[in-house]
């Protein structure tokens, strides 16, 4: 017997920050970043709400954070796929989730990537992201079956939506340029 967990309505325009991603069931508790690997819609078919690559450790991470906090149903972030050389986006995402950001410099604490700075987001957004999702570390895992199994495991352990409402960032810099380099 499945217990129904509480879900919240997802904002109509979610995901509102432009990027290279595929959207699935918006009420799913799972978001997936595939780092340097392109897995098309495989994570979404496995049950993820949103999935896409993450090439940069600054604007790309800001886009992920902005779209995650805008959907309170998201409770897991699966970080999988090949690490991006130089940018090291997987390690940077893990550092952001574990350590946050130096408020004076904007540098992600403990990140080893080339330019790990969050410049377009308030502290409130970063802290909300860190509270909202559990990070599932699958860096360097590219096997679709392993990733699908972990997504399903997260779906089974869904604790329901955050009590807080969606946090929609009105940051004009995020999403500008629209280029692949900024995903």
From Swiss-Prot:
GO terms for biological process: methanogenesis, from carbon dioxide; methylation; one-carbon metabolic process. The keyword Cytoplasm does not apply. It is a single-pass membrane protein. GO terms for cellular component: plasma membrane. The complex is composed of 8 subunits; MtrA, MtrB, MtrC, MtrD, MtrE, MtrF, MtrG and MtrH. HAMAP family: MtrA (MF_01093). Belongs to the MtrA family. This is Tetrahydromethanopterin S-methyltransferase subunit A 2. It comes from Methanothermobacter thermautotrophicus (strain ATCC 29096 / DSM 1053 / JCM 10044 / NBRC 100330 / Delta H) (Methanobacterium thermoautotrophicum).
């Amino acid at each position: 017997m499945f217990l129904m967990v509480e879900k919240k309505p997802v904002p109509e325009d979610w995901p509102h920050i432009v990027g290279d991603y595929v959207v699935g069931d918006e009420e799913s508790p799972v978001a997936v970043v595939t780092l340097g690997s392109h897995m098309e819609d495989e994570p979404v078919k496995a049950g993820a709400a949103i999935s896409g690559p993450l090439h940069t450790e600054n604007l790309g991470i800001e886009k992920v954070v902005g779209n995650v906090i805008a959907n309170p149903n998201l409770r897991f972030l699966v970080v999988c796929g090949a690490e991006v050389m130089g940018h090291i986006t997987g390690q940077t995402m893990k550092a952001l989730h574990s350590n946050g950001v130096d408020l004076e410099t904007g540098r992600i604490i403990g990140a080893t990537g080339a330019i790990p700075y969050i410049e377009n987001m308030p502290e409130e957004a970063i802290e909300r992201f860190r509270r909202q999702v559990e990070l599932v570390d699958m860096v360097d895992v590219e096997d679709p079956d392993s990733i699908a199994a972990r997504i399903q495991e997260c779906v089974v352990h869904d604790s329901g939506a955050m009590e807080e409402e969606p946090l929609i960032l009105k940051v004009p810099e995020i999403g500008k340029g629209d280029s692949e380099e900024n995903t």
